[in-house]
Amino acid sequence: MNQNLHVLSMDSLPVGLRFRPTDEELIRYYLRRKINGHDDDVKAIREIDICKWEPWDLPDFSVIKTKDSEWLYFCPLDRKYPSGSRQNRATVAGYWKATGKDRKIKSGKTNIIGVKRTLVFHAGRAPRGTRTNWIIHEYRATEDDLSGTNPGQSPFVICKLFKKEELVLGEEDSKSDEVEEPAVSSPTVEVTKSEVSEVIKTEDVKRHDIAESSLVISGDSHSDACDEATTAELVDFKWYPELESLDFTLFSPLHSQVQSELGSSYNTFQPGSSNFSGNNNNSFQIQTQYGTNEVDTYISDFLDSILKSPDEDPEKHKYVLQSGFDVVAPDQIAQVCQQGSAVDMSNDVSVTGIQIKSRQAQPSGYTNDYIAQGNGPRRLRLQSNFNGINTKNPELQAIKREAEDTVGESIKKRCGKLMRSKNVTGFVFKKITSVKCSYGGLFRAAVVAVVFLMSVCSLTVDFRASAVS
């Protein structure tokens, strides 16, 4: 029996049998024997460095040929650095990137024998690699006796390679599309998207037309006495008369104008008219085109009260401002302002209950100066004249004498050769007193003072040099 199993080929496995060891079996049996050097016991899994090959080339190196998209390999640990634990997972076309957390593999319930890590192949170079469907589950032993550093051991890991099929996603999408498709009443009729869009567009147009037609009909459906309106009559506004210009005098309508508008009916409004039709109650009525209305004896007074309000000033709205503007000189405006200010603005207290107090007239000179723009009187003169300051000022004389005495005493104590500074001091004060106290004069005075200080400093330096020598 053992001899028959020994000669049995891997390709001739019975239908239904597959090489699918569990995670615990991969570590406790296959990985343990490979690390300890028992290669003959694990010939079903080939040893290969996955970083030297691309993922789409690895399925051809599998010992067991299978139609399933899963392949197992022993992979030696390729350290990226000799003294580190980081592995080199880069290939020519891309790199393997670890994702997620390491999952523990237990033997029983508590004994941890290894970990499983997920790697995803990215085409290109980090960090701009493109994720692919090639995935590896890396199985690593965590027990101390399988560290791979003991005598007779070699560090290995088991890599389970598999590829996610894109067809699965396509089938799921097709199923979702079938669910989302709307129900059709007749399964034999096929309607394309273009036809549906055309139907929707035509329905929108019809609804729009119906809305427009309803606007035309809605105004006529409740009227029995008026003629039917058409769309052209509703839209055409050209029959409206043009608005006349308002450049004319406004006035209350005269009785003649009211009579021309009302015709013969106006005669019935007069108190002495005999065109009223009486009834048993001695009430008067007037016949108009809209029926009969009761009228009062003093209907004319009532019309006057409507056409002209008693509270309004009859002269207030007599004229309307004509179109355009006239250019008026400033002098004329000032004259108008003076005239307007002198007018008494008193109103009829009995009508409005408000009395407006008149404003006092302003002097003509001030008005003229205010109207004239850009002339001198509107400007403020900030410059002052200090011509009265001269050398006869006692304060300047005292300052001059004090400065002369101070400089003279210091020079006499140091050296008699420096007496010429007195002349310099006098020259400086002459310049200062001759300069007017203006902005430019102050600047020139500052310059002279600086020159004076520089001369004093130079004389002091010369004196010290002569004293040292």
From Swiss-Prot:
Miscellaneous notes: Plants over-expressing NTL6 show enhanced drought resistance.
Stretches assigned to the NAC domain: 13-164
Listed name of the protein: NAC domain-containing protein 62
Annotated Gene Ontology cellular component terms: nucleus; plasma membrane
Phosphothreonine found at: T142
Job of this protein: Transcriptional activator activated by proteolytic cleavage through regulated intramembrane proteolysis (RIP). Transcriptional activator involved in response to cold stress. Mediates induction of pathogenesis-related (PR) genes independently of salicylic signaling in response to cold. Binds directly to the PR gene promoters and enhances plant resistance to pathogen infection, incorporating cold signals into pathogen resistance responses. Plays a regulatory role in abscisic acid (ABA)-mediated drought-resistance response.
One Pfam family cited in the UniProt record for this chain: NAM
Gene3D superfamilies per record: NAC domain (2.170.150.80)
Transmembrane portions of the chain: 441-461
Alphabetical list of SUPFAM superfamilies matching this protein: NAC domain
PTM entry text: Phosphorylated at Thr-142 by SRK2C/SNRK2.8. Phosphorylation at Thr-142 is required for nuclear import.
Tissue: Expressed in roots, rosette leaves, cauline leaves and stems.
PROSITE patterns: NAC
GO biological process annotation, one example: cellular response to cold
UniProt keyword annotation of Transcription present: yes
Top-level taxon of the source organism: Eukaryota
GO molecular function: DNA-binding transcription factor activity; transcription cis-regulatory region binding
Keywords (A to Z) from UniProt: Activator, Cell membrane, DNA-binding, Membrane, Nucleus, Phosphoprotein, Stress response, Transcription, Transcription regulation, Transmembrane, Transmembrane helix
InterPro entries, per the entry: NAC-dom (IPR003441), NAC_dom_sf (IPR036093)
